[in-house]
Amino acid sequence: MKTGIITMLFVLYLPVTAFATTLRLSNDIDLLVLDGKKVSSSLLRGADSIELDNGPHQLVFRVEKTIRLSSHEERLYISPPLVISFNTQLISQVNFHLPHLETEREAAHFSTTPRLELLDGDAMPIPVKLDILAITSTAKIIDYETETERYNKADKRASLPQFATMMADDSTLLSGISELDAVPPQSQALTEQRLKYWFKQADPQTRNNFLQWAEKQPPS
């Protein structure tokens, strides 16, 4: 589990900058896509935060919260997928701040008119652009990465076009399979492809820092 989280962090955020921003995770937030790339919820489970570089970022997520019904029963409310874009320049910490979501009425209002804040380490609001990610696919399993790419290319309210093209997609990563070692099971293979891809993109100092850090980690 620890290895999975470590690998994911390295894959998503290289190259590492001297100034980083800590995104504090919330139990009420299901993070789906970060900066145009799919995030595995299983890898995030148990993590308190993730590190981002300073600059523009985009999250796609759902709010998942237990609410009370008029019958005094409880049920899990899951919001539509939301897109939020923001800039972490000169910001060291980002925290989610949700509105009051306890009743069925409040949940219904949030689904149609979502409002939430991102706060910095001093509890001051960070400028954001928030939107609902309208899903066009009719598939049972939604490819949120593809839907986010489509959204970013459509010049919507929270679109960041740079995340529609700057990240290599999985087909690109897997196209170089002949250069790699024997392929393990598919999910492992994809993680390994991403790790090798981003390692090659990093500058020599970042590569050296990562290798030194990795050597100190206990085996999984």
UniProtKB/Swiss-Prot annotation:
The keyword Signal applies. Residues 1-20 form the signal peptide. It holds the Pfam family DUF2057. It comes from the Bacteria. Belongs to the UPF0319 family. NCBIfam families: CrliSynInhib, PRK03641.1. This is UPF0319 protein CKO_02102. It comes from Citrobacter koseri (strain ATCC BAA-895 / CDC 4225-83 / SGSC4696).
